[in-house]
Amino acid sequence: MVTIITLSLLLLSVSLSLGGGLYEVLIVYPNWKYNVEPHTLRAKLESSGQMNSGKRFWPLVSPAQGLLSIINIILAWNYTGEAHNYWLAAAITIFVNRLITFAYFIPEMLRKIMQPEQVEATRLQAIVRRWTALSPWRLLPEIVSWGLLIAALIRLR
């Protein structure tokens, strides 16, 4: 029972993260990633909803997903059934994705993009261009993990 609950919670967190990430990439980023200037970026972040998601959605989803991935790695590691490989691969993939997010994406967003007045214009443009180009790639491991978690859940006995 614990295995089904923890695997399902990880699947839920991946679903939320995947949905939020897709929404940001398709709807939110285009509203602030172009014509980046230190004196206007903060207003663009506010009006696009990026500031709110960075303060209200991601601080809940990302740490929960990281913690759930660790718990699921431990449970999947010790699980001997048919779901083992799918479950473990998904949990490790999500954990690595969270590590990358916490090591690069969150610090860049908080220290530079959300505080644009402190960064020189040319440098800020390069930071935003790189960040918005790399960020969508985080969705690929989440899509793969989502599929692996579904496969694991089907095979769980």
For each predicted feature, which ranges?
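Mid-bilayer segments of alpha-helical transmembrane spans in multi-pass integral membrane proteins
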Residues: 95-103
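Core segments of transmembrane alpha-helices
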Residues: 59-73, 139-147
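Hydrophobic residues within alpha-helical transmembrane segments
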Residues: 12, 63, 92, 137-140
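Interfacial loop at the N-terminal end of multi-pass membrane proteins
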Residues: 3-69, 110-128
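Interfacial segments of alpha-helical transmembrane regions
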Residues: 2-15, 75-96
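Juxtamembrane boundary at the C-terminal end of a transmembrane helix
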Residues: 150-157
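Eukaryotic polytopic
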Residues: 128-135
